[in-house]
């Protein structure tokens, strides 16, 4: 098996990213917020959406928003049929490595309550880092942090 994390670049990449987000993060009944494929945050300076591929098949998504030595991981999802099979940890490890490569020392995330256990197992800690973030899609999320480089 060949795994790769790639920044979203091509029209096919954008389509795959939107498909995964819509099916996993914005599934009917999950949020009252509708998905916006043209949300400006995906293309804002310092924000990079990524896809996790297995043998060229897109399986996961995450966006890394760089804020100096801090990175915020957003919109993390693994396709339904690959969940609970280690792909989330693989995506987490790839994002950590990419963040380190970019000079990020601390990662933060607004974790969905049902994902907190996953993040704890991956070495993250619960830490309130910006309560003003906990609105909209992040309402009800648990803020977490991980130091990835001393």
Model segments located where?
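Acidic/histidine-enriched, beta-strand-rich ligand/metal-binding domains
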Residues: 74-75, 83, 117-121
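Conserved catalytic-core motifs of GNAT/GCN5-like acyltransferases
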Residues: 110, 120, 125-144
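Short amphipathic alpha-helix that is part of the acyltransferase structural core
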Residues: 1-44, 49-57, 150
């Amino acid at each position: 098996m060949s795994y790769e994390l790639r920044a979203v670049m091509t029209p096919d990449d954008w389509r795959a990213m939107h498909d995964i987000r819509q099916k996993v993060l914005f599934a009917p009944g999950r949020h009252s917020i509708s998905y916006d494929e043209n949300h400006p945050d995906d293309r804002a300076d310092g924000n990079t959406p990524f896809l996790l591929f297995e043998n060229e098949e897109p399986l996961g998504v995450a966006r890394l928003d760089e804020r100096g030595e801090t990175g915020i991981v957003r919109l993390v999802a693994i396709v339904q049929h690959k969940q609970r099979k280690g792909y989330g940890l693989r995506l987490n490890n790839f994002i950590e490595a990419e963040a380190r490569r970019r000079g990020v020392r601390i990662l933060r995330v607004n974790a969905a309550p049902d994902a907190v256990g996953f993040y704890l197992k991956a070495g993250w800690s619960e830490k309130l880092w910006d309560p003003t973030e906990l609105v909209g899609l992040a309402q009800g999320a648990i803020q977490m942090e991980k130091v990835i480089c001393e």
